[in-house]
Amino acid sequence: MRAREIQRNWQHLGKRGILFLGILIICSAANNLWVTVYYGVPVWKEATTTLFCASDAKAYETEVHNVWATHACVPTDPNPQEVVLENVTENFNMWKNNMVEQMHTDIISLWDESLKPCVKLTPLCVTLTCTNVTNNRTNANKNDTNINATVTSTDEIKNCSFNITTELKDKKKRVSALFYKLDIVQIKQSEINQSESEDRLINCNTSTVTQACPKVSFEPIPIHYCAPAGFAILKCNNNTCNGTGPCTNVSTVQCTHGIKPVVSTQLLLNGSLAEEEIIIRSEDITKNTKNIIVQLNEAVEINCTRPSNNTRKSIHIGPGRAFYATGDIIGDIRQAHCNISGGQWNKTVNQVKKELGKHFNKTIIFQPSSGGDPQVTRHIFNCRGEFSYCDTTDTVDDTEEEEDTTITIPCRIKQIINMWQKVGQAIYAPPTAGNITCRSNITGMILTRDGGNDNNTRTEETFRPGGGDMRDNWRSELYKYKVVQIEPLGIAPTRARRRVVQREKRAVGIGALFLGFLGAAGSTMGAASITLTVQARQLLSGIVQQQNNLLRAIEAQQQMLQLTVWGIKQLRARVLAVERYLRDQQLLGIWGCSGKLICTTNVPWNSSWSNKSQSEIWENMTWMQWEKEISNHTSTIYRLIEESQIQQEKNEQDLLALDKWASLWNWFDISNWLWYIKIFIMIVGGLIGLRIVFTVLSVVNRVRQGYSPLSFQTLTPSPRGPDRPEGIEEGGGEQDKDRSVRLVSGFLALAWDDLRNLCLFSYRHLRDLVLIATRILDRGLKGSWEALKYLWNLILYWGQEIKNSAINLLNTTAIAVAEGTDRIIEIVYRAFRALLHIPRRIRQGFERLLL
């Protein structure tokens, strides 16, 4: 009884243990995390890509071709979308912004492109005979807003005559034109007439000059830079953003605001304004070598004019080429100038000094430029095709201007301008007929700070207007933008696991994963199938590389195809969008996630990648924070997902190979039973027919041998001998051993007897065949074994013989060598003894002679 009680307790304990073990397994399985792929996550990283332009070019004058080629840009979006990113902090750096470099390169390319079809002024590098243009007028008061001042004859313009080639290259003619004094250099003074001199164009010994086409306009048109698909532009909306550091108010846009490509120095014109206070921006404000960009919060209007009523004439300098020059000046020769409201400018300068004082805690002093290149020491800008060089000394002095006063900035016009983007290349701006007036807004300044060794002891800091690097102009507008690349593929741990075919994972040779795209061409089909993933990836890389090569070819043929830089950028942007999409879809396809936004995998999550719990990840972290945490392990996770998918595909392929055995279960389908019965009846009928045929043939054979056929109804006993009596009634005696033929009656009995005899016949013959085959196989194996034993003994015998022969040969050789060595030693010894005894033999010979 006690044994039975213990047995019952163990049974209950076993059931409870199994239940507890099952719960433990379920709980442990529930705590396992698996890698899950997400497509479309809000993750980005800093990138450098090709931007394209958008512009409302059709809204401007259509008769002229603007140098910015905005007609090749896409139209602007009438309803631009801007999405504010909540709880996002992003770092910006305007001094290391590729958008600035890209815009700088684009503007250079646009200037070059606009000048390609224009006339080269190399034939003008001849001796110019120049005289001063005389015009006796008086200068106006500085405070007069309607300036009618004129310059003296030696100030600005000279009338020059020179020889030039006509339409016929072997003919020359003398022509004259007016040149600004800044555009010519005196060669020598005339000895006869002091007012006459020999001059040349200023560029003839340094650079080539291209005349701007007369239909080209330099009027700045707003350009919107746009990011291609797969990329985005982040915008910092902090009102006090200084262009560097973290920004907490971030939004994403597809295009920037309209940026006017104004080429100017010292003063920034027609840009954007600060929303609150004046912003001071510098890469390192403690270094005096770094420029300081000042963004104003209120625009200051500046009105510039060239009051002289000039006329323009065309001078033919060869077949199909014309040079446009100033023909005459109608009326007074008055100086170009700009007017600024004194009170407004004085207020702005004081605010700038106040902001600079916050950074240096010293007295701020503004001084004029200390000298250098005219493009830096003067405020340069373009007004309706005329390039003006203005002296800004009066704008930085410390005199307090009254509210109603006007600051007049004198300007000088140059027609030959050294292009700010290239060395050894200049542009000739054709004169513009009539009066010229431009109204602009000063929205910023570019300053430089004086250096020195006594910075710590000085109580003043001196700032001067600067510029010259057009990148600073573009930075003043692009400081709040940065380009990022959207990474829509994200990975995170979840408890969901992909249901796959469970098979033992086989090792894959690591060398196969590094084969080239065509490296598996000579491998077997099975070996090449392992590298399909690598081939797909390298095929896409080849497509991308080919597209880049094609674009480089198009860019090289830009002049032939008449493509502007915007056309190239649009081609790049479109191809780049396709490449980005194909790459993402290729990765999803390799991972077995095509067409899925959320895709589970069979890769277990490794705690070394991140040991945070699932709740900490999904409830407390953003996708950007999560991506930064696992960024060092992303490539490893991608590789494991890829290997898992490859193994799954192999398992599925093996499973498909086993599907043919699944059709065996269909044999038991009731719908197939009638077909089975029909086949059975056909087989039985065939066997019966064969039996009948064989029976008829047997009867015919016996009849031919002289026997009569047996009766189908009578059983005839076999005859007995006289010495073999039948058995007695008591059952004694020997039983009869003669067989009697059993007669059957009925069709089924006959069929069953025939089938039984046929099966026995087949069994006996198959048994005999198997026995014969077994006997033959046994004899063959025994013979093979005997042959192998004989061959092995033969090998051992001949091996021993060869060994003995080698030993004998070695012994014989050793003996021969030893005997030869002994003989050689003996001969050498005897020769040595003979040589040694020569003096003795000589002495003995002398002794015999003496005796």
Curated annotation (Swiss-Prot):
A motif (Di-leucine internalization motif) lies at residues 850-851. Pfam families: GP120 (PF00516), GP41 (PF00517). GO terms for biological process: clathrin-dependent endocytosis of virus by host cell; fusion of virus membrane with host endosome membrane; fusion of virus membrane with host plasma membrane; positive regulation of plasma membrane raft polarization; positive regulation of receptor clustering; viral protein processing; virion attachment to host cell. Residues 628-662 form a coiled coil. Disulfide bonds join C53-C73, C118-C213, C125-C204, C130-C160, C226-C255, C236-C247, C304-C338, C383-C438, C390-C411, C593-C599. Residues 457-469 have a biased composition (Basic and acidic residues). Residues 160-204 are annotated as: V2. Residues 657-678 are annotated as: MPER. Residues 304-337 are annotated as: V3. Residues 1-31 form the signal peptide. GO terms for molecular function: structural molecule activity. The record marks R506, A507 as: Cleavage. A lipid is attached at C759 (S-palmitoyl cysteine). Some of the most genetically diverse regions of the viral genome are present in Env. They are called variable regions 1 through 5 (V1 through V5). Coreceptor usage of gp120 is determined mainly by the primary structure of the third variable region (V3) in the outer domain of gp120. The sequence of V3 determines which coreceptor, CCR5 and/or CXCR4 (corresponding to R5/macrophage, X4/T cell and R5X4/T cell and macrophage tropism), is used to trigger the fusion potential of the Env complex, and hence which cells the virus can infect. Binding to CCR5 involves a region adjacent in addition to V3. Belongs to the HIV-1 env protein family. This is Envelope glycoprotein gp160. It comes from Human immunodeficiency virus type 1 group M subtype K (isolate 97ZR-EQTB11). The lineage of its organism: Viruses, Riboviria, Pararnavirae, Artverviricota, Revtraviricetes.
